[in-house]
Regions:
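C-terminal segment of classical bacterial N-terminal signal peptides
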Residues: 16-25, 253
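A residue-level marker of the well-folded mature domains of exported/periplasmic proteins
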Residues: 2-4, 26-357
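Sec-dependent N-terminal signal peptides
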Residues: 5-13
Length: 357
C-alpha cells in the first residue's frame, strides 16, 4: 500500500457556505475544526485513475493551504481492483481516524461492513465513481446516461440529423452498458432520418473497436457516424485503414486522442466525452460541506467531461499526452452543482470552464 501524507496546518475553522441558498440546506450553528481527509483508491492501473489522483492531490493541497481542510492522505491499494486489498487498506486508514473518508471502490457491496465501521465512528463517508447501497454513505458520481446522451446527441448533430450510424457498445452485460445502450437507442429512435446499420461490442476500447470494425466494415454501407463510449480513435483508424470516408465519432478525452483528433482525424462534428477524473475533487468539496453541517442529497450527479469541436484546441493545451481531461472543480462550482441536484436541473446546469494551464 502506498500512502502519501501532508503535514497538518494549523488553521482557523470557517464554515463553508454554499452558494446554493435554498431552504433545503441546513447549516451547522457552531464552528468546527478543519477536517482531516483520507482517500482510498482501489487501484492505480490506468490513465483515468492516475489523472483522478493528480487532480485530487492538486485540489487538496490548495484546500489545505486555504484552511478548508487540515490534512489529507491518499492510499492506493496494490493489485488489480481487489476488494480484499482495499478492505485492508481502509482498516489501516481508519486507525488514523480521519474526519472525511473518500472512496473509489473496488466493489459497490464488498466494502460495506468496513465503510459502516467508518460511519459508526462519525466519519463522513463519500463514495465516488461508483455506487453503494450503504445508507450512511454519500455518493458523488457521473451519470452513464448523461455520458450516452451527450455523446450520442453530438454524433446526431454532427451528421446533420440524418445518415447511417454504427453503435459501438461497451462491456457486454454490464450495468453501465445496459444503461448507455438504452439512452442511445432512445435518442436514435427520435431521429427517424438516422439509420443504425450495425452494432458491435467494443468494450469502450480503441484497439478492440478498430479490430471489430475492420472485420465488418466491408459489409457496411456508407457510415456517417459511430455512436459509442470513447473508442473514437480506433474507429477512425479502422476507416482510414479501409480507405473509407471518416465518420463523426466520440473520442475519449485523453491527451493523445485529442491531439489525433486535432490533426484532422475524424469528421467535423466529432466530440470527446468520458466520465470525469475530477469526481474525486467534487467528492472532496461535497464532503467538506457535509462535515460542516450542510444537508445535501445522498446521491449527487456531476457532469462527464465534454470536449466539443470548438473547444478542442483549448483542451489539448490543458491535457498531457498520458492524462485524461478533467473538470477543475472548486468549492463554488461544486456548490452550484449541488444546487442543481437539489433543484432538479442537473441536465441543464452550466458546465465548468475549460481548464487553463
Amino acid at each position: 500500500m502506498r500512502i502519501s501524507k501532508l503535514g497538518i496546518l494549523a488553521a482557523a475553522a470557517a464554515m463553508i457556505a454554499s452558494t446554493a441558498t435554498t431552504p433545503t440546506v441546513a447549516v451547522a450553528e457552531e464552528k468546527k475544526a478543519a477536517p482531516t481527509v483520507a482517500l482510498s483508491n482501489a487501484f492505480l492501473g490506468n490513465a483515468w485513475r492516475r489523472s483522478m489522483i493528480t487532480a485530487f492531490e492538486e485540489a487538496a493541497t490548495k484546500a489545505q493551504a486555504d484552511g478548508l481542510i487540515s490534512s489529507f492522505q491518499v492510499s492506493n491499494a496494490p493489485g488489480e481492483n481487489s476488494a480484499t486489498e482495499q478492505i485492508a487498506q481502509l482498516k489501516a486508514l481508519l486507525l488514523d481516524q480521519p474526519d472525511i473518508l473518500l472512496v473509489n471502490p473496488a466493489s459497490p457491496t464488498a466494502l460495506n461492513p468496513t465503510l459502516q465501521q467508518a460511519c459508526d465512528q462519525g466519519i463522513v463517508v463519500a463514495v465516488f465513481d461508483s455506487s453503494t447501497d450503504l445508507e450512511c454513505a454519500y455518493i458523488v458520481t457521473n451519470s452513464f446516461g448523461d455520458w450516452a446522451r451527450l455523446s450520442t446527441q453530438a454524433v446526431i448533430d454532427g451528421i446533420g440529423g440524418k445518415g447511417n450510424v454504427v453503435i459501438a457498445r461497451g462491456v457486454q452485460g454490464s450495468p453501465p452498458e445496459i444503461e448507455m445502450y438504452a439512452v442511445q437507442t432512445d435518442l436514435l429512435s427520435k431521429n427517424p432520418d438516422v439509420k443504425v446499420v450495425g452494432e458491435l461490442f467494443t468494450f469502450c476500447d480503441s484497439a478492440k473497436a478498430q479490430e471489430a470494425l475492420l472485420s465488418t466494415i466491408a459489409s457496411l454501407p456508407e457510415v456517417d457516424g459511430v455512436v459509442g463510449c470513447g473508442e473514437g480513435l480506433g474507429a477512425v483508424q479502422a476507416f482510414q485503414t479501409a480507405g473509407r470516408d471518416l465518420p463523426v465519432v466520440a473520442f475519449a478525452p485523453s491527451g493523445r486522442a485529442l491531439k489525433f483528433w486535432g490533426e484532422g482525424n475524424g469528421a467535423p462534428g466529432s466530440v470527446a466525452v468520458m466520465s470525469d477524473p475530477g469526481q474525486g475533487v467534487a467528492a472532496l468539496f461535497a464532503a467538506i460541506n457535509i462535515y460542516n453541517g450542510q444537508e445535501i442529497p445522498r446521491t449527487t450527479i456531476f457532469p462527464p467531461v465534454v470536449v466539443s469541436d470548438d473547444a478542442r484546441d483549448k483542451w489539448i493545451a490543458a491535457v498531457g499526452d498520458d492524462e485524461i481531461a478533467s473538470w477543475q472543480w472548486t468549492q463554488e462550482l461544486v456548490n452550484a452543482q449541488l444546487k442543481a441536484n437539489i433543484n432538479g436541473t442537473v441536465e441543464t446546469a452550466a458546465l465548468p470552464p475549460v481548464p487553463v494551464r
